[in-house]
């Protein structure tokens, strides 16, 4: 059976794994998921990630990060969904928690944070909020 929203599935797997304090979580891999994982790693929300290819199916492994026994990611919320896409221009990209969090945006120049998209001067699809 095919998945209707693979990105929402990725975010839910991360949330669920952190609630039960797992060290890592694995999921089917795709280019967009790897790009989101790279942004999460660059921003310090996860320790690391790796893509393991087993023939035709690749798997994305994400090493989760904790601080003082609590998950580093407190909020992980999907914004743009298959039924209602959310696009924002370069001047309309929202700040998450007044700049304490990050909005992950898919732009023509790749997947990046809200700060980088504003600095680059591009808008795009707001994928999710992370705090």
From Swiss-Prot:
Gene Ontology terms describing biological process: translation
Superkingdom field: Bacteria
Gene Ontology molecular functions: rRNA binding; structural constituent of ribosome
GO cellular component assignments: ribonucleoprotein complex; ribosome
Gene3D superfamilies per record: 3.30.1370.30, 3.30.1490.10
Pfam hit, one: Ribosomal_S8
InterPro entries reported for this sequence: Ribosomal_uS8 (IPR000630), Ribosomal_uS8_CS (IPR047863), Ribosomal_uS8_sf (IPR035987)
Record key words, sorted: Ribonucleoprotein, Ribosomal protein, RNA-binding, rRNA-binding
Record HAMAP family: Ribosomal_uS8_B
Entry's family note: Belongs to the universal ribosomal protein uS8 family.
Biological function: One of the primary rRNA binding proteins, it binds directly to 16S rRNA central domain where it helps coordinate assembly of the platform of the 30S subunit.
Subunit-structure text: Part of the 30S ribosomal subunit. Contacts proteins S5 and S12.
Protein name, as recorded: Small ribosomal subunit protein uS8
């Amino acid at each position: 059976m095919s998945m209707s929203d693979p990105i929402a599935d990725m975010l839910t797997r991360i949330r669920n794994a952190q609630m039960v304090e797992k060290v890592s979580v694995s999921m089917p891999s795709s280019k967009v998921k790897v790009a989101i994982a790279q942004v999460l790693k660059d921003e310090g929300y996860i320790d690391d990630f790796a893509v393991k290819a087993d023939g035709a199916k690749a798997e994305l492994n994400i090493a989760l990060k904790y601080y003082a026994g609590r998950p580093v990611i407190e909020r992980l919320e999907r914004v743009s969904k298959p039924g209602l896409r959310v696009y924002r221009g370069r001047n309309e990209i929202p700040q998450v928690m007044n700049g304490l969090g990050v909005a992950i945006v898919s732009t023509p120049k790749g997947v990046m944070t809200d700060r980088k998209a504003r600095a680059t001067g591009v808008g795009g699809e707001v994928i999710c909020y992370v705090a």
